Swiss-Prot record:
Designated name of the protein: Ribosome maturation factor RimP
NCBIfam families on file: PRK14633.1 (NF011226)
A GO biological-process term: translation
GO cellular component: cytosol
One Pfam short name: DUF150_C
Family: Belongs to the RimP family.
The keyword Cytoplasm belongs to this UniProt entry's keyword annotation: yes
Gene encoding the protein: rimP
Superkingdom: Bacteria
Native source species: Francisella tularensis subsp. holarctica (strain LVS)
CDD domains: YlxS_C (cd01734)
Keywords in alphabetical order: Cytoplasm, Ribosome biogenesis
Length: 150
């Protein structure tokens, strides 16, 4: 699978450069956009993104993991970071999040609340209306931090 191949190539590069690979997202059809999100204990600057992008591009030129043309984007995950795995979810307990499910739960696919806790592969949200809901992480299309600026 393309995403697995990309993680296998990119993870050692980011680690060797001293960064944490936060996640990879592949979007589009035809000409793909490969988004690589990096983090660092001291934050991530534009220069950091350029350094990582240059290294990854050089390896992609040799390994050629993507057939055809693509756009490579390297950035910080930002304040409203996507949560790519259950370990990241565990570290973000207490944060406001937005969840989008793969299939409707009742009649809705979008939920907003506080990431209350993680139990095994389940994330439990305390919704804005005070109700609690649990999702298997694999049933989520997207889970993203949703900063509260009020």
């Amino acid at each position: 699978m393309l995403l697995d191949d990309l993680y296998e190539i990119v993870e050692p590069i980011t680690a060797d450069l001293g960064y944490i690979l936060w996640g990879i997202e592949v979007v589009g059809s035809g000409k793909l956009t490969i988004r690589i999100f990096i983090d660092h204990e001291n934050g991530v600057s534009v220069d950091d993104c350029q350094i990582v992008s240059k290294e990854i591009s050089a390896v992609f030129d040799v390994e050629d993991p993507v057939s055809g043309k693509y756009i490579l984007e390297v950035s910080s995950p930002g304040m409203n970071r996507q949560i790519f795995n259950i370990i990241q979810a565990q570290a973000l307990v207490g944060f406001n999040v937005k969840a989008v499910t793969l299939a409707p739960v009742g009649s809705q696919t979008k939920f907003k609340g506080v990431l209350e806790r993680v139990e095994g592969n389940n994330v439990i949200l305390n919704l804005e209306d005070g109700k609690e809901i649990s999702f298997d992480f694999d049933e989520l299309k997207k889970l993203r931090v949703s900063p509260d600026f009020s």
